[in-house]
Amino acid sequence: MWMTYQPKKKQRKREHGFRKRMRTLSGRNVIKRRRQKGRKRLTA
């Protein structure tokens, strides 16, 4: 077996970043929930 997590900053931002979240309704709901909860970091 090999390590399945090979971190890449660009890929992480593209998949889970703020702009990607804002594109879809469900993504905006994620941001909204995290704001309500008082998360320090909203996205990756």
From Swiss-Prot:
One GO term of the biological process aspect: translation
Taxonomic classification: Bacteria, Bacillati, Bacillota, Clostridia, Eubacteriales
HAMAP family registered for this protein in UniProt: Ribosomal_bL34
Protein's organism: Clostridium kluyveri (strain ATCC 8527 / DSM 555 / NBRC 12016 / NCIMB 10680 / K1)
Coiled-coil annotated residue ranges, if any: none
Keyword set includes Ribosomal protein: yes
Gene that this sequence comes from: rpmH
Entry GO MF terms: structural constituent of ribosome
Protein name: Large ribosomal subunit protein bL34
Transmembrane segments: none
